């Protein structure tokens, strides 16, 4: 007897991502990574050293962990959105330890903190959504060129001892833009926010401590957004190594920020901005 068709054939639904199909797979992924590390612990060491060095600079100068780490991961072939998600997952822990250290050393100005953290979180959520769905690389050359100019200016001010401390006026827009670029580019909160507050005359020690403390809440929200949009794709041996090195170095950065002279800090911030922005521009132009 011939079968009777009940209607037009329906197209099968697209299969959901692996981590959504089976929630246990996220646990399996973590198990595989730890098994790989135990089998070859030497593979973890380079990432531990990079995380330690990057966080030491970030804790003392308020920038560079995200930029250095993301550049490294992308250079090794990791997709930009996965690299950004992995770095922010690591920074959730490193910025938490760094924030506690800066608060303990009285490097935080709380009115400035609250003016930064709310727009920063809003910008971070928008940036995480953008990089998870579209490319945000169009604005990258402009941002890098701007940060290179800021680096040269801060270097000049530090060398010529022209830093006069005063209350910064433009804060909330910096938080919004810094949060957006940090999520969309895998790094940018420190370079954009710290450098522009220093240009306005804010105290280097207070600026670094406040920006780093606000960054904890920013990375927490960005990481949650990435987890919702791309899952646990960012978990890897590299992120585990960056996490270990970063957490070990986080308390030391706050001590360095407290003891470093303002002019010397401006010079070092300028040098870091010039190097990271210059390398980024060279890579884009090559």
Predicted regions and their residues:
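Hydrophobic alpha-helical transmembrane segments of multi-pass integral membrane proteins
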Residues: 206-225, 237
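Small-residue-rich packing faces within the transmembrane alpha-helices of Major Facilitator Superfamily
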Residues: 92-95, 148-151, 216-220, 274-277
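Transmembrane helix-bundle signature of multi-pass membrane transporters/permeases
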Residues: 55, 84-92, 208-216, 273
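Juxtamembrane transmembrane-helix boundary motif
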Residues: 3-4, 8, 12-59, 64-80, ...
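Secondary-structure boundary/capping motif
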Residues: 98, 189, 212, 218-219, ...
């Amino acid at each position: 007897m011939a079968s009777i068709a009940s209607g037009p054939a329906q197209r099968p639904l697209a299969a959901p991502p692996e981590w959504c199909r089976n929630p246990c797979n996220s646990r399996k992924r973590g198990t595989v990574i730890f098994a790989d590390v135990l089998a070859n612990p030497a593979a973890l060491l380079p990432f531990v050293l990079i995380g330690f060095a990057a966080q030491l600079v970030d804790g003392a100068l308020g920038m560079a962990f995200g930029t250095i780490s993301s550049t490294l991961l992308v250079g090794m072939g990791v997709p930009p959105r996965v690299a950004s998600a992995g770095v922010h997952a690591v920074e959730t822990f490193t910025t938490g330890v760094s924030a506690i250290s800066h608060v303990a050393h009285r490097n935080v100005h709380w009115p400035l903190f609250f003016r930064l953290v709310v727009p920063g979180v809003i910008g971070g959520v928008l940036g995480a959504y953008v990089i998870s769905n579209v490319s945000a690389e169009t604005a990258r050359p402009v941002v890098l060129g701007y940060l290179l100019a800021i680096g040269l200016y801060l270097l000049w001010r530090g060398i010529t001892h022209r830093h006069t401390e005063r209350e910064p006026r433009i804060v909330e827009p910096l938080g919004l833009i810094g949060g957006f670029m940090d999520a969309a580019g895998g790094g940018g909160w420190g370079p954009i926010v710290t450098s522009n507050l220093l240009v306005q005359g804010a105290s280097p020690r207070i600026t670094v401590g406040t920006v780093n403390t606000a960054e904890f809440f920013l990375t927490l929200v960005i990481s949650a957004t990435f987890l919702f949009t791309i899952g646990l794709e960012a978990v890897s041996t590299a992120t585990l190594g960056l996490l270990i090195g970063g957490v070990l170095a986080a308390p030391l950065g706050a001590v360095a920020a407290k003891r470093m002279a303002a002019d010397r800090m401006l010079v070092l911030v300028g040098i870091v901005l010039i190097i990271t922005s210059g390398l980024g521009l060279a890579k884009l132009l090559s």
